[in-house]
Amino acid sequence: MSFELDIGHTSQAGRNEVNEDFAALVQGQGRDRERGAIAAIADGVSTGGKGREAAQTTVNTLVNDYFATPDTWDTTVALDRILSAHNGWLASMNRRRQPAVGLTTLTAVVLRGQSYTLAHVGDTRAYLLRGGRLQLLTTDHVMAQRDLAHQLTRAMGLDDHVVVDYSQGELHSGDLLVLLSDGVHGSLPERELRQLLLQPQDANTPSAVGAQALSEEITRAALRRGSTDNVTALVVRVQGALEATLQDESRRAQHLPVLPLLKVGEPVDGLVVTALVADSGVHRIYQVRDPATQRLYALKTLVPARAHDAQERATLAHEAWVARRMQSGHAAVSYTHLRAHETSLH
């Protein structure tokens, strides 16, 4: 299935003279296509008019530099390296320019392979709509006291070191990801947001509203609700997913159960064990047979005692990922049909 996105972006100053929100999305092209896409939204906070600059430079730096990081880096590592460096630069600029200070929130999501990776600082938000259920993916970094409800506890450029919230999850075709500034989510109840996202295009068209139309309607609804801040919405509908990446496989391997010690004749995900070939104390290799074709295969597993070893799980996933990509008459070929029935780690 090809990786296709329907993208919508609307940003307005609202009742303010200056719009200090900024958002962008970049999708990999050519050799970078396998890197997926990155979307980000930022809400600048300033004294002296530097909020817009902070928001714009933070988003542009992240979405452009992401594709320059090594492909072998985990997505969270790539994002953290970029954000740490940019935060240090922004904090240094703020010290030199005081009292004119520019801070910004940031919520960014990378859509890669069959997963998403989220990075978050401040009170911009990310939502995921899947199967009719709207889920908030971020936590607002604001003071708990009622009279200081809008005072940020974390922001890009506030200190030399920034603590970024990272999270990852599976990406499904049909998912709708929505990034919002606080000018939107502070006025628009989640119940109403969900209703907007679920609305059909019209009575005669069962297909969903396009992402651009959704982003426009979300910001209009926030203004109708009395928002006095800038309003920005970035909407991304996933219309297809890429092939699983090594990162996807490694994350998946951490959750699959490890097989018990198997005996000859026992079934394993549609195969039948015919012999124990090797036992290293860490791994076991079994000979297994496909009853449908009578073909024999080798099946490698972790011993139960190493079930909690995250590194061994990741290594086994790495070996399987490499094997599926090797096309050689001199190397073992992965039995890809088994993946459709895989319920355990092997």
Task: Give the positions of each predicted feature.
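PP2C/PPM-type serine/threonine phosphatase catalytic domain
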Residues: 1-298, 304-318, 325-327, 339, ...
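Conserved HxN/HPN-centered segment at the entrance to the catalytic loop
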Residues: 327-335
